[in-house]
């Protein structure tokens, strides 16, 4: 909770500085001279409220959404020795990482994957695919679990939700400024908000949204390296590298995990070129090389 409060306070300060900066550069006066009556401070607050609301609501219901979207079955009472081993392993890794035992589940998917989610590092969910359990060795599964525990211990779910809230805020803010500019300055509309405002705002939100997604995904890729490091510390560097190498062997298999969960899975799929800018995970080769350099 302290992380959320500090992050929100920081971004309120950013909003305030942005508003003051625009005012100092005479942006308000320029828009007013062209018939646009905008209160930038009020607009920023409005966008911040709605920008953060969506990402924070998604964060608080993330465990429920994950269970529903992936069909994850929570292990309350282990029925097999594999489930017993899974619970014991997660408990050991959680204790080493200094967090409370998360919920543990298995989701029905052929591809080898796993994810962690939850609004709090002490109230999380870690789940693995059936395919991962069936085809990976115990050491490889343990390394994957350590990676996911690393996400939880690092607070990545909260951090990414807050980063998403920030970019949502500024996408909404600048899209509405562009919409007003097009409507009032270019089309000279003097009565309310015309069709040009709505069209320009929608187009601007789409374009800015893509650019914002690149920022969020860049940040997500940085967090993957940190989770790999945490996994190496908990399970051993050799085991973590072995798990990533095994994932690389299976890289051609389709990833059926919902898009909302891919940022927190260990296997994010494969894209090249510009599409790689929208990937939540770095290439497996780069992750393996980073661990080798770390030693």
Swiss-Prot record:
Membrane disposition: Multi-pass membrane protein
Regions that span the bilayer: 4-24, 41-61, 158-178, 199-219
Family statement: Belongs to the peptidase M48B family.
PANTHER family: PROTEASE HTPX (PTHR43221:SF1)
Binding residues annotated for Zn(2+), in chain numbering: 147, 151, 224
Superkingdom assignment: Bacteria
Keyword match Cytoplasm: no
GO molecular function: metalloendopeptidase activity; zinc ion binding
Gene: htpX
Enzyme Commission code: 3.4.24.-
Pfam families in alphabetical order: Peptidase_M48 (PF01435)
Cofactor, free-text remark: Binds 1 zinc ion per subunit.
UniProtKB keywords: Cell inner membrane, Cell membrane, Hydrolase, Membrane, Metal-binding, Metalloprotease, Protease, Transmembrane, Transmembrane helix, Zinc
GO CC entries: plasma membrane
Name of the protein described by the UniProt record: Protease HtpX
InterPro entries given in the database record: HtpX_protease (IPR050083), Pept_M48_protease_HtpX (IPR022919), Peptidase_M48 (IPR001915)
Top EC group: hydrolase
């Amino acid at each position: 909770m302290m992380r959320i409060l500090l992050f929100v306070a920081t971004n309120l300060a950013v909003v305030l500085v942005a508003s003051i900066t625009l005012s100092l550069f005479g942006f308000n006066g320029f828009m007013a001279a062209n018939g646009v009556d905008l209160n930038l401070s009020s607009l920023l607050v409005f966008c911040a409220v709605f920008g953060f609301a969506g990402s924070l609501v998604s964060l608080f219901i993330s465990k429920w959404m994950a269970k529903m979207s992936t069909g994850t079955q929570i292990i309350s009472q282990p029925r097999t020795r594999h489930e017993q081993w899974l619970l014991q392993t997660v408990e050991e890794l959680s204790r080493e990482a200094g967090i409370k035992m998360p919920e543990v589940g298995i989701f029905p998917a052929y591809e080898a994957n796993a994810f962690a989610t939850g609004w709090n590092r002490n109230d999380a969910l870690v789940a693995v695919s059936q395919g991962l359990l069936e085809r990976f060795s115990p050491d490889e599964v343990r390394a994957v679990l350590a990676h996911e525990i690393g996400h939880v211990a690092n607070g990545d779910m909260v951090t990414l939700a807050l980063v998403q809230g920030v970019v949502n805020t500024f996408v909404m803010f600048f899209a509405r400024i562009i919409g007003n500019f097009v409507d009032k300055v270019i089309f000279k509309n003097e009565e309310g908000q015309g069709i040009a405002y709505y069209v320009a705002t929608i187009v601007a939100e789409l374009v800015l949204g893509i650019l914002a997604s690149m920022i969020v995904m860049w940040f997500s890729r940085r967090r993957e390296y940190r989770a790999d490091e945490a996994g190496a510390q908990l399970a051993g560097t050799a085991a973590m590298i072995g798990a990533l190498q095994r994932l690389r062997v299976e890289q051609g298999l389709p990833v059926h995990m919902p898009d909302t969960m891919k940022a927190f899975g260990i296997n994010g799929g494969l894209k090249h070129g510009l599409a790689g800018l929208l990937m939540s995970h770095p290439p497996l080769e780069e992750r393996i090389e980073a661990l080798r350099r770390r030693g």
